[in-house]
């Protein structure tokens, strides 16, 4: 079995590197590099379709590149989209690869694209511009949508706005794939929402806040409700920290949260509070 991993290099003149993992000797080896898009900020793969999306830069402008994953993990460049206002901080694809959500941290904007791989074409079909600020004058002078995540059944997209201390809920109509704004949730001032992780059972959602290093637990099956808040730091830690990422294991048994400053990865068991 061949295991291929794609990584993005966040520096000029570098793009995507494909690695092969050898299960026998436990080593990685470089297969190839792709440079259609450079200074990578995020990579995203569609779950049920063979597409890899890469956010980065080209000639000093923001760019999204679309690749088809073909045999043996090779990448075929399909198309791209140039965004002159800035660069993207996060990408999220629908499972079938037909919709792509992109957040632009610097401009306060979230773009939604229709992916037509047969043409190939990446067409922007909707945009949301957010406003707001928070008490942290260095990091929250304006809206900064850091990420967009889709719920497991893909009826809901959640935008984490680090600058405005908000979560924005977008509903997705399944047949037409149209997206509309539903409501917002106000977080604790100064916490800085960063990333979202959904439990695979479709009942629970977890928010990681960058500035306060906390984990919020929500129920959302019937209504949106915050039911718990815990620290993402060990009790013994003293110092500055910026929380980084949060993930739920595929079986739903474990929740992972990483930190920069404390420089660790925390493991929580039984993340679903049942």
Feature map (PLM): residue ranges:
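Short loop/turn segments immediately following beta-strands, especially the blade-tip
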Residues: 20-25, 68-73, 114-121, 171-177, ...
């Amino acid at each position: 079995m061949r295991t291929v991993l794609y990584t993005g290099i966040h520096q000029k003149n570098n793009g995507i590197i494909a690695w092969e993992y050898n299960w026998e000797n436990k080593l990685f080896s470089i297969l190839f590099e792709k440079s259609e898009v450079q200074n990578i900020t995020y990579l995203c793969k569609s779950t049920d379709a063979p597409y890899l999306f890469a956010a980065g830069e080209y000639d000093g402008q923001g760019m999204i590149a679309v690749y088809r994953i073909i045999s043996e993990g090779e990448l075929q460049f399909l198309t791209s989209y140039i965004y002159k206002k800035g660069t993207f901080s996060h990408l999220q694809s629908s499972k079938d690869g037909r919709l792509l959500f992109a957040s632009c941290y610097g401009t306060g904007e979230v773009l939604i694209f229709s992916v037509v791989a047969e043409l190939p074409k990446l067409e922007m079909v909707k945009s949301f511009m957010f406003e707001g600020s928070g008490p942290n004058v260095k990091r929250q002078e304006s809206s900064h949508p850091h990420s967009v995540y889709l719920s497991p059944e893909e009826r809901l997209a959640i935008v984490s706005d680090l600058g405005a201390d908000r979560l924005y809920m977008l509903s997705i109509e399944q047949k037409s794939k149209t997206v509309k704004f539903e409501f917002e949730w106000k977080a604790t001032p100064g916490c800085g929402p960063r990333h979202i992780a959904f439990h695979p059972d479709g009942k629970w959602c977890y928010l990681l806040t960058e500035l306060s290093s906390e984990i919020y637990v929500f129920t959302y099956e019937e209504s949106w409700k915050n039911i718990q808040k815990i620290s993402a730091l060990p009790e013994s830690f003293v110092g500055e920290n910026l929380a980084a990422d949060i993930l739920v294991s595929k079986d739903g048994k474990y929740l992972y949260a990483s930190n920069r400053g404390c420089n660790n990865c925390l493991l929580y068991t039984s993340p679903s509070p049942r």
